[in-house]
Amino acid sequence: MKELLFATGNKSKAKRFTKGLLEHDIKVLTLEDVPINIEVEENGTTAIENALIKARAYAKETNLPVFAMDDTLYLENVPEDKQPGMYVRRVNGKRLTDEEMIEYYSNLAKEYGTNGLITGRWIYGMALISNGHEYTYTWSKENFYITSTPSKIINPWYPLNTISINIKLNKYFTEITEEDKLLIQEDESHVVDFLVNSITDSKAKKKNNF
């Protein structure tokens, strides 16, 4: 079985692609599985740039193919200077705690939303490095609401879920059940296809000395 390193320490994030890649005989490893301890300065201006920075840094430390991803958040009707972009947790140079994030974004919804609701969209950037070749991919997920009224439940790692509402179900993400997830699960097989096809392409190029 082939191994592919995901440049993240977040196991829950890795689960998004684990099953699909296993079907292609590829096992996903995270930074918890490999003896690499480096600091990476993510100073790119886009999600793709940051993903490339992370992938390049870890590719130098291992012989494994490496992929990394980053995301940006766009909020409708919010001024450009207040758009979170890549810095969802960092506001005015300060890294926010979970509680501060909930307060800050719920206040944005109150100020710029309609009836306390702002429409948001996550846009993702991914980079893979294999056999010295670089590949990039971007996609977005379905719109959702950020509300000025928080749920009473806070998710570790994902504090924005406390003030985020799935439009299809009209439920807070923190209150969505396993049954609900089956109804709203977005097909990310195209991301798995990108990873598999990129690895396959890099092997072909290596074989042909490209």
Regions found by a protein language model. Name each.
Residues 2-5, 12-19, 23-210:
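Anionic-ligand binding patches
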